[in-house]
UniProtKB/Swiss-Prot annotation:
Catalytic activity: 4-hydroxy-4-methyl-2-oxoglutarate = 2 pyruvate; oxaloacetate + H(+) = pyruvate + CO2
Descriptive protein name: Putative 4-hydroxy-4-methyl-2-oxoglutarate aldolase
Binding annotation for substrate: 75-78, 97
Domain of life from the UniProt record: Bacteria
Oligomer status and interactors: Homotrimer.
Annotated family: Belongs to the class II aldolase/RraA-like family.
Biological role stated in the UniProt entry: Catalyzes the aldol cleavage of 4-hydroxy-4-methyl-2-oxoglutarate (HMG) into 2 molecules of pyruvate. Also contains a secondary oxaloacetate (OAA) decarboxylase activity due to the common pyruvate enolate transition state formed following C-C bond cleavage in the retro-aldol and decarboxylation reactions.
PANTHER family cross-referenced by the UniProt entry: 4-HYDROXY-4-METHYL-2-OXOGLUTARATE ALDOLASE 3-RELATED (PTHR33254), REGULATOR OF RIBONUCLEASE ACTIVITY A (PTHR33254:SF29)
One GO BP: regulation of RNA metabolic process
GO MF, one example: oxaloacetate decarboxylase activity
Organism: Stutzerimonas stutzeri (strain A1501)
Required co-factors: a divalent metal cation
Cofactor binding description: Divalent metal cation.
Amino acid sequence: MQYVTPDLCDAYPDLVQVVEPLFSNFGGRDSFGGEIVTIKCFEDNSLVKDQVDVDGTGKVMVVDGGGSLRRALLGDMLAEKAARNGWEGLIIYGCVRDVDVLAQTELGVQALASHPMKTDKRGIGDLNVPVTFCGVTFRPGEYVYADNNGIIVSPEPLSMPQ
């Protein structure tokens, strides 16, 4: 499904929250959206690795990496697994790596920046808890939509206006 966030904002101005414009597109899909699944972690992508193995059909993984610019929370191997398992996309409040491969992967990926260093795997983090960054709280079970214009959050699913 192709989402256009300006059109969604125009159609649902009282329903959506707009995330501060700090993110860039790194994935092969410029537009994506779905039900929110959250991960809160810091320089440890163990839970991201676990979740990409789960069926993500219709879902977007929102990863609160604390805004760290020192390690990448997603790379090519995890992105390819996420795409194979039906994830619509990932929004990473942190960094990604292997960006040339990510751009070829059928997956939406938005993040703050790229960084070549991988994370440690210490098994530390929280799954499906509300996370807040860039002026918005992301709650599991709510909905997020992203494109080259930005990222928006809604408490309910949105349809593109006709």
